[in-house]
Design a protein with these regions (language model features):
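Glycine-rich phosphate-binding loop of nucleotide-binding enzymes
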Residues: 1-24
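Long, low-complexity segments enriched in small/aliphatic residues
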Residues: 88-183
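Short strand-coil-strand connectors
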Residues: 51, 159, 214-218
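Long, contiguous, secondary-structure-rich segments that constitute the structural scaffold
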Residues: 56-120, 176, 181-194, 198-277
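Flexible glycine/proline-rich, aromatic-decorated loop/lid segments
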Residues: 18-54
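Beta-sheet entry/capping signal
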Residues: 10-12, 28-29, 162-164, 192, ...
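Short, solvent-exposed amphipathic alpha-helical segments in soluble enzyme
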Residues: 1-6, 28-29, 156, 180-184, ...
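Short, well-ordered loop/turn and helix-capping segments at boundaries between secondary-structure elements
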Residues: 8-11, 28-35, 59, 75-80, ...
Length: 277
């Protein structure tokens, strides 16, 4: 669906560090900077810790800093923002985001990083979220808990599509491989449809044998790999190798009504022997 929508655009501009599949469709490519070594700014880790990032190497010829690209685009649209400055932009973010308000560059450098939320420059940041809930006596309301009712996936199983497919990543690869496929890995392996050994017997297919995997939206061909960690009736495909196996040709574009999360993890499929002509 994304390929169809992007292909229908009259003009597509992509800014990226790598020549991705999306960049291949672009009319204009703006080569961006490598945030981890070529640009000034901040980085936020998965523990909510904000730290300073400094440019370690100069930009290659023909490459602009991401800030410079945005500022030049603004200028083309009639907005003069002056000269790009990472600290000025960060301070603008602090004004708009209360949980970052206390994180000046000076404090980030002195403390080696601060965990959000940090509401003012006297605030130390919070090691864990919702800390007030653990205070004695409790300040403010208690956390609401309530039971939720189970709702089946939109893509229902039946006799025609009896297997539940879930998608995901391999340990050594990341998404479509724009970053991770550029280096070799002893763990890397080709795309496979992973099945339980019991399902291999049920459908009379062997390890390495090609099968056709079909859903209500499309089909792909992939070799079988047995995984004893999968229960019968559950299959797995990675999302990394679109040229080998176009996994998302199978998945559904339904979304969770509350979170908006795509239901990529629950596709109804069937597998059939494949005769390679």
């Amino acid at each position: 669906r994304a390929v169809k929508l992007l292909g229908g655009l009259k003009f597509l501009v992509v800014q990226d560090l790598f020549y991705t599949k999306t960049a291949e469709m672009a009319d204009v490519i703006l080569p961006g900077s490598a945030g981890w070594c070529e640009t000034e700014g901040t980085v936020t880790s998965s523990e909510r810790r904000v730290q300073r990032v400094r440019a370690a190497v100069p930009l290659p010829d023909g490459v602009l800093d991401d800030m410079e690209i945005v500022f030049r685009l603004a200028r083309q649209f009639g907005h003069e923002w002056g000269k790009p400055d990472a600290e000025t932009i960060w301070n603008e973010l602090r004004q708009l985001s209360p949980m970052h308000a206390g994180m000046s560059y000076k404090r980030l450098e002195e403390l080696g990083g601060i965990q959000w939320p940090c509401y003012d420059e006297a605030h130390p940041g919070e090691m864990y979220l919702h800390s007030r809930l653990w205070q004695e006596p409790l300040i403010g309301p208690r956390a609401p808990f309530h039971a939720v009712e189970f709702e089946s996936p939109v893509d229902e199983l039946n006799e025609q599509f009896p297997i539940r497919l879930t998608t995901g990543r391999y340990l050594d690869s990341y998404n479509t491989g724009a970053q991770s496929e550029r280096f070799p890995s002893p763990l890397r392996r080709a795309a496979t449809i992973d099945l339980s050994p019991e399902d291999g017997e049920r459908y009379q297919v062997g390890e390495g044998e090609k099968v056709r995997v079909s859903s209500r939206r499309g089909s792909v061909v992939a070799p079988v790999r047995f995984d004893s960690g999968l229960r019968p009736g559950l299959a797995f495909l990675s999302v990394h190798f679109h040229e080998q196996v176009a996994t998302n040709d199978l998945t559904i574009d339904a979304v969770d009504p509350k979170s908006g999360t795509s239901e990529f993890k629950a596709t109804a499929i069937r597998i059939e022997k494949y005769l390679d002509n």
